[in-house]
């Protein structure tokens, strides 16, 4: 054994061993209990960062621990490889997105292997591989047949410079995340997935996921946004049309004095009178340039414009002016809001600003409200007034009666509304999965026949940086023939949102080489669902919701039999340095390559796991990294120094141990119990490592080390340290394990067995108090009786001065913990 720990030499040796022996290859085995561990796969941006190191180290600890516990572990890795950054790089570097992407994948794969991560690389996939995305095209066609994929005109975020649609999360303070241009709202025909068909089931199952953080489930429930209320029709004055409104506050209907429409509402211009057209059109253009999320903020200035038209309140028959309001969106309800200024704060501020009449219809019990003197809207429950037959009722109780009345009179109906909107998947960019549709002047939109799949992304597109979709300019791709009539036709040039690829990759990992369809049902039945999924909370309402939706769709299409993709979810914290999240813009990035070159991957892993619990943010510390490296050197030296002593150790005989030996063995098995519980039950890796460090300290102070009688227990202690550290620092421990004379790998050797008898304390530390104040401590035998402990407390030399000459009133004994002597 080398006297000095040389990380690079040790790590290179074991990485080669694992690769040559396919040590982490997973195969289906129904005789063994499976465990599917997965971290969210990365975008191949070019380099891994410390966030990756932490995330993947967390997952690797769990995977290695489960293997040592005897589970059949699936732990795959792949690449979320489509996306706009590849096109940006192609423009900047005058190369092709495919070349840039695959070069990055090769480099990052090498980085992940250098970290010693126990992936089954035989299952590696990249979403830009045609062997992956062709099956996604098939799924799209199946969804199209079922009516789950459709095309509609919708309002989208549009960057005029990039000439593409932006997702909400790609709009930052009203500007494009890529070029910083002002983002407009634009009406475009977009392909969408009907996720709203699954809204109720998606919501219901948030109450059936006990292994998910409640914070994530709450975010999803709020995003789905189920609310019960009424749809009410407001007749338009002088027309046959009606404005349909959804409200959860039908109890305030009698107080509705004006109507607010979203500027994007389809009736906005229809209802605008000629004399108001110029003002309204200018207002609509202004709102189009405003960030949609900002428009709903409480501190956002509420503005509107009168259309010149009126509608009629169906229960009071009062005229209500119709306004366009910047805070109303088409994303919720119908895009029209019956405005009740006395009972809604936004409506209150708007009515005050534009001098719109107000009327109180709910007031606190025993108090009369005057609209002229109200400082703010009254939004609490109260007593109905000025509401016809409903006067005198409590507003909460009146809701159901008013809903029944509206249905009986044909004015409205009870309904359930969702904040969730269908998922728009069209993207006007090249580096994505082509949508398999064809447009024919005679036949309209025609799906590509399944036998003609895949629609392959052409490699001869050019990237000029001038905006627009490069696919539009590839004639050989665009021009085709109609599958129905054989006439000239054009291909769809929009590609799918990259969230589509990440919505089912975890299923494809179960059968990456399956050639007869998207999924091998037998293999997915064995592996799914994912037992532990790991990723950032920023994906709570996008990726995690889409993945749940897609799993249910694939179930209903007959590809799998599961309802939910992820049984347990861990959302890890960020890596913080100098008080901020690591980022290039802040100049506080730590390069994992430099860290690994200096200290080795095991030190990088150990620090990232020891510095904080997984769900908390990790504060970077150079001293912490040094400390982790010193600890590994200490363990290495301990093994090196004791190897001559324990090399020829005989079998362990617990009955023949000295008191010192029993004490060491007790500490060993207490540590095994704690580390096992910390990993298995809580993922508290930091406390598991701390407990192992304490055991190392105990071994180092253990005397006499050189006694042949103590060699077996010393060997057990050393081997236990190595085994307990194995999931955290795998190269380091495999090398020590081999040096200790073991032929099997650590994962074959298994997790150390806990001996409950060995962990039992023979002595206890009991605190002694006099009148509730600490006066001494006793070490007593576990078997000591209550009388024995009380007698020892009274006889203790440190206690005597506080009780001499005083009367002992009583002695309180808390078994195994404390004695309190009450004197007077």
From Swiss-Prot:
ATP binds at residue 584. The keyword Cytoplasm applies. It is found in: Cytoplasm. One of its GO terms (cellular component) is cytosol. Its EC number is 6.1.1.4. Its main location: cytoplasm. A motif ('KMSKS' region) lies at residues 581-585. Gene3D superfamilies: 3.10.20.590, HUPs, Isoleucyl-tRNA Synthetase, Domain 1. It is an enzyme of class 6 (ligase). Keywords: Aminoacyl-tRNA synthetase, ATP-binding, Cytoplasm, Ligase, Nucleotide-binding, Protein biosynthesis. GO terms for biological process: leucyl-tRNA aminoacylation. The keyword Endoplasmic reticulum does not apply. Belongs to the class-I aminoacyl-tRNA synthetase family. PANTHER family: LEUCINE--TRNA LIGASE, MITOCHONDRIAL (PTHR43740:SF2), LEUCYL-TRNA SYNTHETASE (PTHR43740). This is Leucine--tRNA ligase. The gene is leuS.
